[in-house]
């Protein structure tokens, strides 16, 4: 993958807003020392996180909150 595009990532994530949230959380993990799941190739952390998402190495799980009755 020479360049990672938004379209590459949108195959794995439902919408652009969710993609931004997922990528930013992964960048924070990488910044704190998490090991990259793809070859970083001296890229910035943002590019590495997008490459991981496009490769299907990073995903998400939606959690629905249940309403509490008052």
Swiss-Prot record:
Task: Tell whether Chloroplast is among the UniProt keywords.
Answer: no
Is Transferase given among the entry's keywords?
A: yes
What's the catalysed reaction?
A: RNA(n) + a ribonucleoside 5'-triphosphate = RNA(n+1) + diphosphate
Q: Which Pfam families match?
A: RNA_pol_Rpb6 (PF01192)
Q: Name one GO molecular function term.
A: DNA binding
Q: What is its EC number?
A: 2.7.7.6
Query: Record's superkingdom?
Result: Bacteria
Q: For this entry, list what GO says about its biological process.
A: DNA-templated transcription
Alphabetical UniProt keywords: DNA-directed RNA polymerase, Nucleotidyltransferase, Transcription, Transferase
Identify the Gene3D superfamilies for this entry.
3.90.940.10
Disulfide bond residue pairs: none
**Cellular component aspect of the GO annotation:** DNA-directed RNA polymerase complex
InterPro entries, per the entry: DNA-dir_RNA_pol_omega, Pol_omega/Rpo6/RPB6, RPB6/omega-like_sf
| PANTHER family noted in UniProt | DNA-DIRECTED RNA POLYMERASE SUBUNIT OMEGA
Its family? Belongs to the RNA polymerase subunit omega family.
Tell me the function of this protein.
Answer: Promotes RNA polymerase assembly. Latches the N- and C-terminal regions of the beta' subunit thereby facilitating its interaction with the beta and alpha subunits.
NCBIfam families assigned to the protein according to its UniProt record, in alphabetical order: rpoZ
The subunit field of the Swiss-Prot or TrEMBL record says: The RNAP catalytic core consists of 2 alpha, 1 beta, 1 beta' and 1 omega subunit. When a sigma factor is associated with the core the holoenzyme is formed, which can initiate transcription.
**Protein's name in the database:** DNA-directed RNA polymerase subunit omega
Organism annotation: Pelobacter propionicus (strain DSM 2379 / NBRC 103807 / OttBd1)
User: What gene name is given for the protein in this entry?
Assistant: rpoZ
